[in-house]
């Protein structure tokens, strides 16, 4: 693991490999193909190798002591094989060509390996959190994204990670992160620039590129976390794996992953040399392209174009071994980036021009609507003035003389109120006030018309009710008259009958002593029927002599004849005093 005591690691073919320029030299599958063999102790100011051996030497990085990060130094980029990695972990697809951003500081293979280690480290942390619980795994994922996005410092990440997992990390973690995290952040920044996004947006959309469990072989979590029984000491790593002797038949999974360490950007790298095809020397071909990641393909195209069309500002600059040129990459723009910037500026100016044109059209439409509103306001004010003149109702004699003046006055008011004014003195409040007055006048007229309609409807309803009431009263009067006629008919029928009582209709046993015509069943019915009978009693005896009529007790001597008319009957009834007594025949019968 990185972070231990600095030491030199041996590579099977890093010091004494055969010269690739020799035609008859045998080449091992895992040996570098086109890198000139040179000892590790080469000084920084040593002149570059001949062009026949290394193509594009101006971009070839130097092997200075600054390249020994975390105590591990590695060989240059391998073309057809997988260089040995510490702890025997194969880089896999995680050796992204985007790691070549750090080639001005580290050798390409070293930068790619450090990025691969960092990604495996972060992936292992997340898997360890998921093994504890899904909640802790989510918290660890959030902390990792915050660390890569630079929203958390390394110390804050370290403290919060220990708080979330309750496991202390090994001492080498913080130096490892401080040494390798800038590489990952520069890779993220460059990928985000290519995708025209911010680093946070790019990381949110391509999170699987950072935390992909299948991208590389995860590290054992016990190598990152301290155990209680170890008393703060980490276990000794396997020296055979660190020395690259991991090609054991017991580890076939590394052999299956080894062809994927060749990214497209490394195939098109100028350090490969033009004398070799992209697939390299006799080596089994790699897996299909779908095993590469998207960022590998994008970075391959980017660097291929960058090497084909080199920046003319960089051509006269010779390569200075050991010099740091990250500022040039970060702050200087290539012709392609300048073209993109000018394209963005052009689009922005076009958008601004479109907005200005739309604003002008909107102002024109508003001005036309304002003129139409003025005309409609003038129309309503003219109608209002005419209605006011009609309401005032000037005398007929004065109306012809005053009509012209009264019609001119509203026109003058209208022109005075709505005359075209300069834009500076134009008050929208007056327009709104006059518009509200016109609308209120229309409302008042509508309400007056509605009230008139309601009053007319009420009047018609009252008339209809009165007519119906008169009809009902006439019907009731007719019914009463019909009932009285029916009663008289019944009485007449009773008068014709001599055997039934005139009051109740039962069998009669007595006769009225006044007229000797009315028949009753008893004195009760005679008294009950007296109110109706006294009008006709005695009319049949007008031609008879008076002494023949028996007199009753308390009854007058002579009964005056009843008039046939209702007035005579009323006067005759008034002249009679009280109710007649029981006739003599009735008294004799009762005895």
UniProtKB/Swiss-Prot annotation:
GO molecular function (one): zinc ion binding
Ranges in coiled-coil conformation: 433-488
Binding sites annotated in the UniProt record for Zn(2+) 1: 501, 504, 521, 525
One Pfam family named in its UniProt record: NHR2
Family matches, as SMART domains: TAFH (SM00549)
Positions of the UniProt region annotated as Mediates localization to the nucleus: 1-381
Domain of life: Eukaryota
Binding site for Zn(2+) 2: 512, 515, 533, 537
Biased composition regions of type Basic and acidic residues, renumbered to the chain: 230-256
Zinc finger (MYND-type) boundaries: 501-537
A GO cellular component entry from the record: Golgi apparatus
Similarity field: Belongs to the CBFA2T family.
Task performed by this protein: Functions as a transcriptional repressor. Regulates the proliferation and the differentiation of erythroid progenitors. Plays a role in granulocyte differentiation. May also function as an A-kinase-anchoring protein.
The name this protein goes by in its record: Protein CBFA2T3
Gene that produces this protein: CBFA2T3
């Amino acid at each position: 693991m990185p972070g231990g005591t600095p030491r030199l690691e041996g590579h099977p073919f890093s010091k004494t490999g055969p010269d690739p320029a020799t035609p008859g030299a045998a080449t091992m599958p895992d040996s570098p193909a086109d890198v000139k063999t040179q000892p590790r102790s080469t000084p920084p100011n040593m002149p570059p190798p001949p062009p026949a051996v290394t193509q594009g030497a101006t971009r070839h990085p130097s092997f200075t002591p600054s390249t020994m990060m975390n105590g591990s130094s590695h060989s240059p980029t391998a073309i057809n094989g997988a260089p040995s990695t510490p702890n025997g972990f194969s880089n896999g697809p995680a050796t992204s060509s985007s790691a070549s951003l750090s080639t001005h500081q580290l050798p390409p293979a070293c930068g790619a390996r450090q990025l691969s280690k960092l990604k495996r480290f972060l992936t292992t942390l997340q898997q360890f959190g998921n093994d504890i619980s899904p909640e802790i795994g989510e918290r660890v994922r959030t902390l990792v994204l915050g660390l890569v996005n630079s929203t958390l410092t390394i110390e804050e990440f370290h403290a919060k990670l220990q708080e979330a997992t309750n496991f202390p990390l090994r001492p080498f973690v913080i130096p490892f992160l401080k040494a390798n995290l800038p590489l990952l952040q520069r890779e993220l920044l460059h990928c985000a620039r290519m995708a025209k996004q911010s680093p946070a947006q790019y990381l949110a959309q391509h999170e699987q590129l950072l935390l992909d469990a299948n991208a590389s072989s995860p590290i054992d979590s016990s190598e990152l976390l301290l155990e209680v029984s170890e008393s703060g000491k980490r276990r000794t790593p396997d020296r055979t794996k660190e020395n690259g002797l991991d090609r054991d038949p017991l580890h076939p999974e590394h052999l299956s992953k080894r062809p994927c360490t060749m990214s497209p950007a490394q195939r098109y790298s100028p350090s490969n040399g033009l004398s070799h095809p992209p697939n390299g020397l006799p080596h089994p071909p790699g897996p299909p392209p779908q095993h590469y990641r998207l960022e590998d393909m994008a970075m391959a195209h980017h660097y291929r174009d960058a090497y084909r069309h080199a920046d003319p500002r960089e051509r006269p600059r010779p390569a200075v071994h050991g010099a740091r040129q990250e500022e040039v990459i970060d702050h200087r723009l290539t012709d392609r980036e300048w073209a993109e910037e000018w394209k963005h500026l052009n689009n922005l100016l076009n958008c601004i021009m479109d907005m200005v044109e739309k604003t002008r059209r909107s102002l024109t439409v508003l001005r036309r609507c304002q003129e139409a509103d003025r005309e409609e306001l003038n129309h309503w004010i003219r109608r209002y003035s005419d209605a006011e003149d009609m309401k005032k109702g000037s005398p007929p004699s004065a109306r012809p003389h005053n009509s012209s003046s009264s019609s001119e006055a509203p026109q003058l008011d209208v022109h005075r109120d709505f005359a075209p004014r300069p834009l500076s003195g134009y008050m929208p409040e007056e327009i709104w006030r006059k518009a509200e007055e016109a609308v209120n006048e229309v409302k008042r007229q509508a309400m007056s018309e509605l009230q008139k309609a309601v009053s007319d409807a009420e009047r018609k309803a009252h008339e209809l009710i009165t007519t119906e009431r008169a009809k009902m009263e006439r019907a009731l009067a007719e019914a009463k008259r019909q009932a009285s006629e029916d009663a008289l008919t019944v009485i007449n029928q009773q008068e014709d009958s001599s055997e039934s009582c005139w009051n109740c209709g039962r069998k009669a046993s007595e006769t009225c002593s006044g007229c000797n015509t009315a028949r009753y069943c008893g004195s009760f019915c005679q008294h009950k029927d007296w109110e109706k009978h006294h009008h006709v009693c005695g009319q049949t005896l007008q031609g008879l002599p008076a002494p023949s009529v028996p007199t009753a007790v308390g009854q007058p001597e002579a009964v005056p004849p009843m008039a046939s008319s209702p007035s005579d009957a009323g006067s005759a009834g008034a002249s009679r005093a009280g109710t007649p007594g029981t006739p003599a025949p009735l008294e004799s019968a009762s005895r």
